[in-house]
C-alpha cells in the first residue's frame, strides 16, 4: 500500500474517501496474514477506534464494532475484516447507497456475529452508544502524533506502509 494521495491535491471529500479506501485495501490484503500471525502467537493486535476522516460511515461502523467487542468478542476481528472488505467493495463500485445499518447487519451475520447482537445494531448506532469510545480513540491517536490509518507498530516503531504492500510482507517484517 502506498500513500499516493500525499502528492496529489484533492478536495477534502475525495481525499477522505481515498484514505479510507487505502485503509480498506490494507486490511483486506492482510486479513488472513494477521489472523495467522495472531493464531501463531507472533503478534498482539490492538484495534482502536479512530475517526480521522469525518465520515458518517465511520460512526455507524464504530458503534457496531463497539457492540460486537462488548457482546460477541470472539467475532470482533472477523467483523472488522468484513466491514473493511465491504467498504472496499462499496468504494470500488462507487455505491454509497450501501453505507447503511442494514449493510452492517448483513456483514455482521456473514462474519459470524450472533443475530442477537446484530439485532441491536440499529439502536446502538441511533443512540451513538460508542461515540465516547470513538472520540477517546481518535484523541489518543492524534495525541500520539499519528496522521493516517492504518498505523502499524512493530517493536514500538511505526512502519512505513510502503514496506507492507504484499500479502506476506507483515510476516516477513515481523520475522526479521
Per-segment meaning from a language model:
Residues 1-28:
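Local sequence-structure signature of Cys/Sec-based thiol-disulfide redox active-site neighborhoods
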Residues 3-4, 25-96:
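Structural alpha/beta surface segment adjacent to cysteine/selenocysteine redox centers
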Residues 6-16, 36, 106, 119, ...:
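Polar/charged alpha-helical tracts
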Residues 10-11, 92-99, 107-112:
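Short, exposed beta-strand "edge-strand" segments with a Pro/Gly-rich flavor and a Y/T-containing core
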Residues 18-20, 89-90, 122-123:
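A short, structure-level motif marking secondary-structure boundaries and short turns
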Residues 22, 109-176:
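C-terminal cap of thioredoxin/glutaredoxin-like
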Residues 29, 33, 59-63, 67, ...:
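Extracytoplasmic/secreted proteins, especially bacterial periplasmic and envelope-associated proteins
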Amino acid at each position: 500500500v502506498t500513500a499516493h494521495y500525499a502528492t496529489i491535491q484533492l478536495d477534502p471529500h475525495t481525499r477522505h474517501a481515498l484514505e479510507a479506501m487505502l485503509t480498506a485495501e490494507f486490511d483486506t490484503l492482510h486479513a488472513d496474514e494477521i489472523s495467522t500471525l495472531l493464531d501463531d502467537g507472533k503478534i498482539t493486535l490492538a484495534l482502536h477506534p479512530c475517526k480521522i476522516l469525518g465520515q458518517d460511515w465511520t460512526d455507524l461502523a464504530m458503534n457496531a464494532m463497539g457492540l460486537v467487542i462488548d457482546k460477541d468478542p470472539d467475532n470482533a476481528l472477523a467483523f472488522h475484516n468484513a466491514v473493511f472488505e465491504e467498504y472496499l467493495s462499496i468504494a470500488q463500485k462507487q455505491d454509497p447507497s450501501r453505507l447503511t445499518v442494514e449493510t452492517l447487519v448483513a456483514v455482521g451475520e456473514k462474519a459470524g456475529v450472533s443475530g442477537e447482537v446484530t439485532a441491536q445494531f440499529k439502536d446502538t448506532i441511533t443512540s451513538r452508544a460508542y461515540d465516547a469510545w470513538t472520540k477517546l480513540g481518535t484523541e489518543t491517536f492524534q495525541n500520539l502524533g499519528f496522521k493516517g490509518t492504518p498505523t502499524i507498530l512493530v517493536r514500538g516503531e511505526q512502519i512505513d506502509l510502503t514496506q507492507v504492500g504484499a500479502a506476506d510482507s507483515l510476516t516477513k517484517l515481523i520475522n526479521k
